[in-house]
Amino acid sequence: MIGKKSFQTNVYRMSKFDTYIFNNLYINDYKMFWIDSGIAKLIDKNCLVSYEINSSSIILLKKNSIQRFSLTSLSDENINVSVITISDSFIRSLKSYILGDLMIRNLYSENKDLLLWNCEHNDIAVLSEVVNGFREINYSDEFLKVFFSGFFSKVEKKYNSIFITDDLDAMEKISCLVKSDITRNWRWADICGELRTNRMILKKELESRGVKFRELINSIRISYSISLMKTGEFKIKQIAYQSGFASVSYFSTVFKSTMNVAPSEYLFMLTGVAEK
């Protein structure tokens, strides 16, 4: 670590479709990153975020969310990803330096996993210059506090951070979450815990669409079961359990009420093979 163990800097070179996974070594700290050219996609393993970034984007992943994210290059040419790991203690020390109540709320809010700014290139160039200097210059703690608090305050005021986890509605968020662990016995408490939101908020949004929670979970699992059927590699019993149903009989009941045909018949229509 550099700068009294407050920072760690790395640059990763990525070819098209290469994926950089933000590991869980520093989950109690923050990660800030940007790419030098082209485009890449930031992906949440729970599917709550899938967002294309470019060389104007700066992303700050907040503590306890780092391990959920990965970055995939979509560029034909190689790109470089600059990543800074910033200690939680350093971020906390900035509170008295940052200008603007909005930036303070956004930076320290536990309800937002990340902040994203689409900046002008000169702002990114200044950040890159300071970060590149870590290897040769022994910056004082005071300089780093003044620089980063000033940088955060400036970009928030000029560009306004984007909370990209807010782009999806409740149904999409729940759907993506269930798909990420299809066999889990999802309950309201699990969903609300993962999404960091109140049950009444989610329930109200589902009710406004005439959708019941258990029906939504089952429809997601039925959709997944059909994708397994299309491969022609699984029997009904395997499909039922791999789709998250507790029993084959319950799977068959839900499937027939949804598709108006028994799963064995549907499998035959897809593959032409009758299950014995």
Curated annotation (Swiss-Prot):
PROSITE patterns the record matches: HTH_ARAC_FAMILY_1, HTH_ARAC_FAMILY_2
Cell compartment(s), UniProt: Cytoplasm
Ranges for domain HTH araC/xylS-type: 172-269
Record keyword Phosphoprotein present: no
DNA-binding region: 189-210, 236-259
GO CC list: cytoplasm; protein-DNA complex
Name assigned to this protein: TCP pilus virulence regulatory protein
Organism for this UniProt entry: Vibrio cholerae serotype O1 (strain ATCC 39541 / Classical Ogawa 395 / O395)
Gene behind this protein: tcpN
